[in-house]
Amino acid sequence: MGKVLIAMSGGVDSSVAAYLLKLSGWDCVGATMTLYRNEDIGISRSRTCCSLEDVEDARSVAFRLRIPYYVFNFSDEFRRQVMDRFADAYGQGRTPNPCIDCNRYLKFRHLYDRAVLLGCDAIATGHYARIEQENGRYLLKKALDASKDQSYVLYMLTQEQLAHTQFPLGALHKAETRQLADSLGFFNARKPDSQDICFVPDGDYAAFIRRHTGKADTPGDFVDESGRILGCHRGIAHYTIGQRKGLGIPSNRPLYVKASDPKSNQVVLSGNDALFSQQLTGENFNWIAWEAPPRQFRCSAKIRYRQTEQPCEVTVEEGGSVQVLFDRPQRAITPGQAVVLYDGDTVLGGGTIL
């Protein structure tokens, strides 16, 4: 065992994780990251992730468990490494996953640095995933509760990070976590799970980007696959691949967003059939299962958080980019999202879809 810093959000998962670690003999320290103020993101009274109420919830659990507790202000880092990247990606016609950047830069970098300063040997979170050691490497594995598995948003973890990370909930089902919290008398046992992107709780990404960048939307043309103008769009940030709602284009067939081009400021619309493709290119890959991957191999790939993995063949190019050829065409492969590769319940690695 040793000393561990637990990332506590005020929710049931991180609270039970803290309890389990203390029960198993770890010297526990709790910490909550404050990432923004509601006023800074244009929200007046909405309860969001990392709100003051959540800080008090986490503090109450830490007090009940009799463990030290800290609050760390990472708002500058969050703005620079998560919010700015989110806004920039949408401006480039991509659809990012900010939870992955939050894990990469905040939880497993800045929070871990604080853990080291506090003399901790490891950090822990309430993620549903598992870490196992095999043949001298640390492997990231799916949680036993497939419906709550979060390995997709953890693909960026390095060997060094995996060696100093604990996921106490990886072998539990969510129902068991809530039952345990109930039995312990935790007041947050029935607290709802966080939903959507924490700093855009209303789901209006375009409005957030306007506030964050200070730039107004730039209207442009909707075009079909041949380039014929179909109408006017409100700004590229309003649209993502596969979207049908909110287009406002009269048509005798359903139309969907197929692509967006920030250079021409055009959004391409098509029928549903044109959204399917069998191949993608990924970049910035992090490999977990190997130091260096085979040049070609078969596995399964996931291209969005709640999707079931799909069988595919992978080719690793000389420069490090990755070609993924699916056995069957996939709908709405979206640039900016993560592609994560699996062998059964083991994460092989992952990267960003081009």
Show the residue positions of the predicted features.
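AMP-forming adenylation/ATP pyrophosphatase catalytic core
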Residues: A124-E132, G136-L354
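ATP-dependent adenylation/nucleotidyltransferase module used to activate substrates
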Residues: M1-Y155, Q166, A175-E176, D182
